[in-house]
Amino acid sequence: MTNDSVPAKVMEIVAKQLEKDQKEVTPESSFANDLGADSLDTVELVMALEEEFGTEIPDEEAEKITTVQAAVDYIQNKMDDGKIKLEK
């Protein structure tokens, strides 16, 4: 997986976790306001991202990830820092 493929993968994970059609999920989508996620949904979503990308997202960082784009940015920044290495 490359840095460029992260947005599509994040949107796929969000759609699956929140049981939404992928067409409903955009980079600007807010998990709570646009996609109807509650706090438990958000925790499960962060866990799914951690599992997919092989990283740990600290709680203080997870609280800042409220949109699809915020999740993409977080993952891409970790990749740029060399903290996530993807071979998929």
From Swiss-Prot:
Q: Name one Pfam family in it.
A: PP-binding
Keywords linked to the UniProt accession? Cytoplasm, Fatty acid biosynthesis, Fatty acid metabolism, Lipid biosynthesis, Lipid metabolism, Phosphopantetheine, Phosphoprotein
Q: Which domain of life is it from?
A: Bacteria
Q: Is the RNA-binding keyword given for this protein?
A: no
Q: Which GO terms describe its cellular component?
A: cytosol; membrane
Q: What is the protein's major site of localization?
A: cytoplasm
Q: Which residues form the signal peptide?
A: none
Q: Subcellular location, in the record's words?
A: Cytoplasm
**O-(pantetheine 4'-phosphoryl)serine (modified residue): where?**
S39
Biological process according to GO: lipid A biosynthetic process
Q: Which Gene3D superfamilies match?
A: ACP-like
| Residues of the Carrier domain | 4-79
User: Which molecular function GO terms apply here?
Assistant: acyl binding; acyl carrier activity
Q: Pathway, according to UniProt? A: Lipid metabolism; fatty acid biosynthesis
What HAMAP family is this protein classified in?
A: Acyl_carrier
What family does the Swiss-Prot or TrEMBL record give for this protein? Belongs to the acyl carrier protein (ACP) family.
Query: What is the name listed in the Swiss-Prot or TrEMBL entry for this protein?
Result: Acyl carrier protein
What is the species of this protein?
A: Trichodesmium erythraeum (strain IMS101)
